[in-house]
Amino acid sequence: MSDFIASKEDDYSKWYLDIVQKAKLADYSPVKGCMVIMPYGYSIWSKIQSILDKKFKETGHENAYFPMLIPYGFLEKEKDHIEGFSPEFAIIKDAGGESLAEPLVLRPTSETIIWNMYSKWIKSYRDLPLKINQWANVVRWEKRTRPFLRTTEFLWQEGHTAHATEEEAVEETLLILDLYKRFMEDYLAIPVFCGKKSEKEKFAGAVSTYSIEALMQDKKALQAATSHYLGLNFAKAFDVKFQDKDGKMRHVFASSWGISTRLIGALIMVHSDEKGLILPPRIAPIEIIVIPIFKKEDEINKKILDYSDCVVHALKKAEFRVEIDKDVRSSPGFRFSSAEFKGIPIRIEVGINDVLLNSVTIMRRDKDRKFKYQISLDSLASKVKVELDSMQKDLFKKALNFRTLNTKEIFRIGKDSYELFKAYMNDHSGFVLSCWCGGLDCENIIKNETKATIRCIPDDFKAKDLTGMACIYCASRAKYFVLFAKSY
């Protein structure tokens, strides 16, 4: 199987695309920039959905669905919002054989349509907070696309909340940011930096944007999630007011936040290898694959298959997500490689010797193929749990070690510091922690000269002392520690 996949070191982009297609995660559609998410890829998205949906409901959010067709006039109501998204609009001007009185935009994001509805639903302080989540599709007319990472249409969730006070809205924004961080690290086994975006990089229409930033194996950063504090911007644009306890009319404060199918791309790029996909157990649709190793004799094969069914039954009874591969036409080696390519965490082999010894042979996806051992059926469930937990931790630890090795600190300590910074960014990739004055000119020049952007003002380094620190470009007094990186 790995003979048909590009080398990660020689052609990272093709390696990624090979995994997407040959693991049957997605395929190209007839529409440029759009993808078909295949059943196995969609099962990963379904797993992401089920975990996050439960967490959203635990924090008081409800699901709803809003139209994907948005009147163009709605988007014009928030100036910054339309300026930020208008280049990516897909606009419908004709329908039903007639020209529309007002063009409709295919949903690029839902703030405007949702806040139009909130103006009808919110009248009193008793209506607040209003916390709604939507699972939907989005259309943004991207010029350069890549499956899962950047597509014209993609799936996502978007949360939209309304609050009586600024404090509540900011608290909600940061609560969701932390929820995303824990999800990324605890379930996807991807270490992330969290922090505030610069004014240049923030969401169009937000007061402030916070992001989750991860490092891929090609040492480029990927923005995995965002959470926005919207202030009063959309409430004023759509005249959303409530009567407070004193009878005064006030505008409501807002947040919005989201993640998308881009996370599947992140999973591939953080964990996978040249044998194919590697999935952390907690997010894998299939945790265990049981592969009977058939012989030529039908009588022996029946014993192997009956025993394999018993193994599957025992694992399902212990509430593992398990499947069996009963393909008699393909060789064991091909079936092993197929399971590896799909990234299934645990492979259990069942041969006639296992039947006779009341045992099975276990193999872990993230270990070398030599790492396999026999274990009795009686202790299988407990041992599998240990291996799955260990694999989850090991994948996170490996990704964290990789990020640590590829996060460098470069501060201004002399007149040549920026040239050293620029040379490093042009010759290497990864995160670079440095200092910034907060100036847009410096940010733009650094981006133009290095292709690196400010990914965020990271929370991890808030405790660091800025006394005596200077902007890496202009040498004026630094206001922030920032993370620079080239990114997707």
Curated annotation (Swiss-Prot):
Coiled coil region boundaries: none
Transmembrane segments: none
Tagged with keyword Ribosomal protein: no
Molecular function GO terms recorded: ATP binding; proline-tRNA ligase activity
Xref: InterPro entries: aa-tRNA-synt_IIb, aa-tRNA-synth_II, aa-tRNA-synth_II/BPL/LPL, Anticodon-bd, Anticodon-bd_dom_sf, Pro-tRNA-ligase_IIa, Pro-tRNA-ligase_IIa_arc-type, Pro-tRNA_ligase_II_C
GO biological process, one term: prolyl-tRNA aminoacylation
One Pfam family named in its UniProt record: ProRS-C_1
Catalytic activity annotation: tRNA(Pro) + L-proline + ATP = L-prolyl-tRNA(Pro) + AMP + diphosphate
Protein location: Cytoplasm
EC numbers on record: 6.1.1.15
An annotated GO cellular component: aminoacyl-tRNA synthetase multienzyme complex
Chief subcellular location: cytoplasm
CDD domains: ProRS_anticodon_zinc, ProRS_core_arch_euk
SMART domains xrefs: ProRS-C_1
Keywords per UniProt: Aminoacyl-tRNA synthetase, ATP-binding, Cytoplasm, Ligase, Nucleotide-binding, Protein biosynthesis
Function: Catalyzes the attachment of proline to tRNA(Pro) in a two-step reaction: proline is first activated by ATP to form Pro-AMP and then transferred to the acceptor end of tRNA(Pro).
Family: Belongs to the class-II aminoacyl-tRNA synthetase family. ProS type 3 subfamily.
Quaternary organization: Homodimer.
Domain notes: Consists of three domains: the N-terminal catalytic domain, the anticodon-binding domain and the C-terminal extension.
Name this polypeptide is given: Proline--tRNA ligase
